């Protein structure tokens, strides 16, 4: 089964992709040319460049941020209660239909 993920960019333009379970939200975005998700550290949770907002309907389903992830997010001026690092959310069948809001890249 493929998992559908919808990415909504900072201009409110949405794009839905289908990917195999087991990849991160960040890796799925990067391999499908989704703009506004950077990957400075390659997805190892050391940079916060892949900061996204999880749609409120999906926050409980995506789990909670680890201590390391929370530490990186605490340095972000744009942090919200639904902020996550997209490299730390692994897609599964339970997340089929997930909606992610991306941030405009910093200059």
Swiss-Prot record:
Residues 3-106 form the 2Fe-2S ferredoxin-type domain. GO terms for biological process: P450-containing electron transport chain. The keyword Iron-sulfur applies. Induction: By the monoterpene alpha-phellandrene, but not by acetate. Keywords: 2Fe-2S, Electron transport, Iron, Iron-sulfur, Metal-binding, Transport. [2Fe-2S] cluster binds at residues 41, 47, 50, 87. This is 2Fe-2S ferredoxin CtmE. Belongs to the adrenodoxin/putidaredoxin family. InterPro entries: 2Fe-2S_ferredoxin-like_sf, 2Fe-2S_ferredoxin-type, Adrenodoxin-like, Beta-grasp_dom_sf. Gene3D superfamilies: 3.10.20.30. Pathway: Terpene metabolism; monoterpene degradation. It comes from Castellaniella defragrans (strain DSM 12143 / CCUG 39792 / 65Phen) (Alcaligenes defragrans). Its cofactor is [2Fe-2S] cluster. It comes from the Bacteria. Involved in the degradation of the cyclic monoterpene limonene. Probably part of an electron transfer system involved in the oxidation of limonene to perillyl alcohol. Disruption phenotype: Mutant cannot not grow aerobically or anaerobically on limonene, but it can grow on perillyl alcohol or on acetate. Binds 1 2Fe-2S cluster. GO terms for molecular function: 2 iron, 2 sulfur cluster binding; electron transfer activity; metal ion binding.
